[in-house]
């Protein structure tokens, strides 16, 4: 709009009557000027937009300052949180490794225990299934198995001790699992909080990206504030331009007031129209800020105008009136743009607030976790490790005891088979002895008969010629040989020692250790008569054990 203004006339009313008719006819009608004055007054309501523009600039500046502070705080907290989260997940990984390692070792030990117990039970079952041959036991006794000669109280006590160790380890493992599950719940809640944080960061970044020419801001964890200074500068430029546009509207209004007042009958109309001016609208260039200033401007005396000056003022007024509506629309467009920019600024501020709140929530959660519950999770892992080390030693000892018992009972089975083979061997030796005795008896009897016959022949042929006292034994019969069975002494160290060990024993020790043979009442050693197949089976089992051992 034009900024030219006409000087005021000293007197009101229409121009002089002596003017030429053509100029008088060119003068505008008062109602036309009044309509322009009313429109100009209406356009001054745009001052509300200017005030709003100032508020927007102030709010945007405050939001930018807050964003700088909040972003700095968030960045500081986030760097600390990253370190704490890495440490927290390292602790969780270590605790989980302790649990998995202990579980694996415990499972391996349990498998070894199961295998050893299975072997022991299988051996005990073989003892139950192996019936002692009746030939070994007194006549009339109920059948017995090898298991009847075993005291299982040691096995039961060992099982009870192992069960106690297993139960204690299982309880410690269950407590560790419960602790780890609670730890996982803590991590899950932290993940949820991190999800809230990421959502807020993504939203803020998307808004920042939409207002920027590049999308680099959307790739960062915190929204970029690089666009906010430019937006604030844009708001300031809009506000300044709106103030300039409002100033042009005020000048146009002043021009309308002056034109109406210089028109005959327009003074009262101008005063009536300008009686309720918006507060703060400057009139007649005096920048009045209240109604009293406006009234003073309206009551001020007018400077006289010539017809040409008046006509020039009216021409400027008409020209500006045609542009006033566009100026008002431009102010409205600018305030709409400023509102949109402010909304974007406040949205980024709110997003940063959300990120900061989410960050502080995570920080408080981590602080609470680190000061109260995390030491308990770590202590539970140490407790499990201590319990497992203690019980692992006990279980390893019990495993060795199970193996020893199994070896003992397996040796019992092997010894019983060896006993059967030994009985068969002794039976065979007895048979050989009997054969030797039979052969010897036959030869002795034969010699005896021959000797008796020879003595009788000698007595018949020579006896009558020899005096009886020449040899008293001449008429005696041959001696007779009798075999007597004597029970053997117990096989003691003397009989079992090696030759060089026997030589080291003194005569007294040898006399003490060697038990004298005891004559049995029945004169014979009882050797059980075992079936051939029983002996063969025992011998086959012994061979299988020897082969399996090699």
From Swiss-Prot:
Residues 1-24, 204-226 are annotated as: Disordered. It comes from the Eukaryota. The keyword Cytoplasm applies. Belongs to the ATG17 family. GO terms for molecular function: molecular adaptor activity; protein kinase activator activity. This is Autophagy-related protein 17. Residues 317-354, 427-451 form a coiled coil. Its main location: cytoplasm. It is a peripheral membrane protein. Autophagy-specific protein that functions in response to autophagy-inducing signals as a scaffold to recruit other ATG proteins to organize pre-autophagosomal structure (PAS) formation. Modulates the timing and magnitude of the autophagy response, such as the size of the sequestering vesicles. Plays particularly a role in pexophagy and nucleophagy. It comes from Neosartorya fischeri (strain ATCC 1020 / DSM 3700 / CBS 544.65 / FGSC A1164 / JCM 1740 / NRRL 181 / WB 181). Keywords: Autophagy, Coiled coil, Cytoplasm, Membrane.
């Amino acid at each position: 709009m034009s900024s030219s203004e006409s000087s005021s006339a000293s007197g009101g009313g229409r121009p002089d009557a002596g003017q030429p008719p053509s100029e008088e006819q060119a003068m505008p009608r008062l109602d036309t000027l009044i309509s322009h004055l009313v429109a100009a007054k209406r356009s001054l309501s745009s001052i509300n937009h200017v005030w709003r523009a100032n508020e927007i600039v102030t709010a945007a500046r405050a939001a930018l300052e807050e964003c700088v502070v909040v972003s700095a705080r968030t960045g500081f907290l986030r760097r600390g949180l990253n370190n704490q989260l890495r440490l927290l997940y390292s602790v969780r990984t270590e605790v989980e490794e302790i649990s998995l390692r202990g579980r694996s070792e415990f499972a391996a030990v349990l498998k070894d225990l199961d295998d050893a117990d299975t072997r022991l039970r299988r051996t005990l079952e073989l003892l139950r299934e192996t019936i002692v041959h009746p030939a070994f036991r007194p006549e009339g006794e109920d059948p017995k198995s090898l298991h009847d000669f075993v005291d299982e109280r040691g096995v039961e006590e060992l099982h009870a001790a192992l069960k106690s160790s297993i139960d204690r380890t299982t309880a410690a493992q269950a407590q560790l699992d419960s602790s780890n599950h609670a730890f996982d719940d803590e991590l899950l809640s932290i993940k949820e909080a991190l999800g809230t944080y990421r959502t807020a960061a993504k939203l803020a970044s998307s808004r920042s990206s939409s207002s920027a020419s590049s999308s680099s801001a959307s790739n960062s964890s915190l929204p970029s504030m690089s666009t906010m200074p430019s937006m604030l500068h844009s708001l300031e430029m809009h506000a300044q331009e709106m103030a300039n546009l409002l100033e042009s509207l005020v000048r146009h209004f002043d021009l309308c007031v002056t034109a109406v007042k210089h028109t005959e009958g327009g003074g009262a109309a101008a005063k009536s129209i300008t009686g309720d001016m918006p507060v703060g609208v400057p009139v007649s260039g005096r920048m009045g800020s209240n109604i009293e200033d406006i009234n003073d401007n309206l009551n001020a005396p007018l400077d006289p105008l010539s017809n040409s000056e008046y006509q020039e003022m009216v021409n400027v007024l008409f020209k500006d009136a045609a542009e006033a509506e566009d100026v008002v629309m431009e102010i409205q467009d600018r305030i709409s743009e400023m509102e949109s920019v402010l909304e974007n600024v406040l949205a980024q501020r709110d997003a940063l607030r959300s990120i900061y709140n989410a960050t502080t929530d995570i920080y408080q959660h981590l602080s609470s976790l680190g000061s109260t519950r995390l030491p308990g999770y770590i202590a539970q892992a140490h407790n499990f490790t201590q319990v497992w080390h203690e019980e692992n030693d006990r279980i390893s000892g019990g495993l060795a005891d199970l193996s020893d018992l199994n070896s003992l009972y397996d040796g019992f089975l092997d010894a019983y088979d060896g006993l059967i083979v030994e009985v068969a061997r002794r039976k065979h030796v007895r048979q050989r002895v009997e054969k030797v005795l039979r052969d010897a008896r036959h030869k002795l009897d034969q010699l005896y008969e021959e000797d008796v016959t020879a003595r009788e022949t000698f007595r018949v042929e020579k006896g009558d010629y020899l005096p009886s006292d020449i040899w008293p034994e001449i008429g005696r019969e041959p001696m007779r040989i009798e075999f007597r069975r004597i029970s053997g002494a117990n096989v003691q160290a003397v009989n079992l020692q090696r030759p060089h060990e026997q030589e080291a024993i003194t005569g007294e020790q040898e006399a003490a250790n060697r038990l004298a043979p005891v004559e049995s009442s029945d004169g014979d050693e009882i050797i059980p008569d075992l079936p051939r197949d029983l002996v063969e089976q025992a011998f086959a089992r012994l061979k299988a054990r020897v082969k399996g051992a090699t």
